[in-house]
């Protein structure tokens, strides 16, 4: 499944 693009700061 595709994961949402969430850049971790």
Swiss-Prot record:
PROSITE patterns in alphabetical order: PYROKININ
Keyword Secreted carried by entry: yes
Record-listed Leucine amide modification sites: 9
Subcellular location: Secreted
Keyword Glycoprotein: no
Major subcellular site: secreted
Alphabetized UniProt keyword annotations: Amidation, Neuropeptide, Secreted
A Gene Ontology BP annotation from the UniProt entry: neuropeptide signaling pathway
One cellular component (GO) term of this entry: extracellular region
One example GO MF annotation: neuropeptide hormone activity
Function according to Swiss-Prot or TrEMBL: Potent mediator of visceral muscle contractile activity (myotropic activity).
Family per similarity comment: Belongs to the pyrokinin family.
UniProt protein name: Locustamyotropin-3
């Amino acid at each position: 499944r595709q994961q949402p693009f969430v850049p971790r700061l």
